[in-house]
Amino acid sequence: MPKTSYLNKNFESAHYNNVRPSYPLSLVNEIMKFHKGTRKSLVDIGCGTGKATFVVEPYFKEVIGIDPSSAMLSIAEKETNERRLDKKIRFINAPGEDLSSIRPESVDMVISAEAIHWCNLERLFQQVSSILRSDGTFAFWFYIQPEFVDFPEALNVYYKYGWSKDYMGKYLNDNQREILLNYGGEKLRSLLSDRFGDIEVTIYSPSDPNASTVTAENSQFLWRAAITLNQFKEFVKSWSIYTSWARDNPSKPDIADIFINELKEICHCEDLNVPLKIEWSTFYYLCRKRE
């Protein structure tokens, strides 16, 4: 997998868990409606602190979360114990492409939330196919970026600091950029179709209706919220690319502060605690193992 500060044992996983959004039940319901198989076993690839794991686990009897970050898993395990789910959920500290500890054709569903861009896709899809039962479902999804509803020009600032190679975007490789900016991209779709069928792709982009396959009214993965610029700054600081930038530029001003100051001007918002309306660009894939 590509280098990421998430693998650092000192990564602020508790901060990550506190500021990252959860996933809507409407999305989970859509996934379960698509699923035709039994509901015994679930595997969550790149489970991190368990954001998706705990949303989907009620539908299954056995759950395995896999993540290469021991710091992330420590948070997931703590919450598992607090929820008294330690007999139902277990975690494996391994890359998403390494599913060798799971018995072939033993899993009903594999999910991955905001994670497969860290994986070798060809290897990942081969491994997922090998552990799924013949009627098994593979579902993965991403939220891409929050778009400021009343200030569409703020998206340019987001692209500048979050995606461009001049700033934090330089810590994303070309494959990751393709997945995140092109709703999966052609390479992903080609590799996926080699091993999976009945592929459904659902895209919602507030700023690009031509790319969207659904409207806001019928999207099952719709995130609308009010967020302050201070809250948004904490979200930025949860990014691995932010941590990497801060590590490599210790003598420079905090890139998150610079980012927020530009947004403050664009959004005409002197008070960083004033809520601003946002809407997320999202996409998700649903598919089944080929017979």
Swiss-Prot record:
CDD domains named among the record's database cross-references: AdoMet_MTases (cd02440)
Keywords: Cytoplasm, Methyltransferase, S-adenosyl-L-methionine, Transferase
GO biological process, one term: lipid homeostasis
A GO CC term assigned to this protein in UniProt: cytoplasm
Enzyme class name: transferase
Record-listed E.C. numbers: 2.1.1.-
Induction: By cell wall perturbation.
Pfam families registered for this protein in UniProt: Methyltransf_11
GO molecular function: methyltransferase activity; mRNA binding; S-adenosylmethionine-dependent methyltransferase activity
Localisation per UniProt entry: Cytoplasm
Presence of the UniProt keyword Transferase in the record: yes
Functional summary from the UniProt entry: Probable S-adenosylmethionine-dependent methyltransferase which mediates cantharidin resistance.
Family: Belongs to the methyltransferase superfamily.
Note: Present with 4380 molecules/cell in log phase SD medium.
The protein, known as: Probable S-adenosylmethionine-dependent methyltransferase CRG1
